[in-house]
Curated annotation (Swiss-Prot):
Annotated transmembrane regions: 76-96, 98-118, 138-158, 162-182, 193-213
Function: May be involved in both secretory and endocytic intracellular trafficking in the endosomal/prevacuolar compartments.
InterPro entries: Prenylated_rab_accept_PRA1
Protein name (database record): PRA1 family protein B3
Subunit and partners: Interacts with PRA1B1, PRA1B2, PRA1B4, PRA1B5, PRA1B6 and PRA1E.
Region (Disordered): 1-24
UniProt keyword terms in alphabetical order: Endosome, Membrane, Transmembrane, Transmembrane helix, Transport
Transmembrane helix listed as a keyword: yes
Family named by the database record: Belongs to the PRA1 family.
Any one cellular-component term (Gene Ontology): endosome membrane
Pfam families: PRA1
Organism: Arabidopsis thaliana (Mouse-ear cress)
Amino acid sequence: MMANPPTLPISDHSGGGSQSQQPVSTPAFRTFLSRLSSSIRQSLSQRRPWLELVDRSAISRPESLTDAYSRIRRNLPYFKVNYVTIVSLVLALSLLSHPFSLLVLLCLFCAWIFLYLFRPSDQPLVVLGRTFSDRETLGVLVILTIVVVFLTSVGSLLTSALMIGFGIVCLHGAFRVPEDLFLDDQEPANTGLLSFLSGAATSAAVAAASTPASGRV
């Protein structure tokens, strides 16, 4: 009786290939987190001293609406990082006081990150046995975002928090006398989060160019 020929490990190679393709998005996600962290640190390093922000000797009532508007225009570029921090804190406190809204936003953010932005283009999204194309995935995420932001309490919470933050910024900018303020020497145009956004856009373009022809349409 002839011996059976050895079985070629075809399934093992294909399984290993699929496993090697799964972490394709890991370097891109790590690069995104690294650029985000460095941009936040760079932006925070440009903030003004908080004691200067709350200096009572520099607080006075504006003489007119024109004077208040002029003060706001001069204070905004000078305290921009501090103002963004204040608005972010107001937004964070509002979300922490509403845990359900915070959970909904986190789920929505994770859906965008892991189902579309950093999902490998050669791995289609399969839910309940149905394969979704990239256009269908994008459409579902956009509709879900619209529903969450405009048809739930999340949208009103974000709007009210942002309005409170902007109100604090405008109130401080109108009452802070800017005569003793001066901007640093010509700063680069793209710094901090702006440079991060431009860099992220460039990275996304490079990643899209490097994907195979069978990737996203």
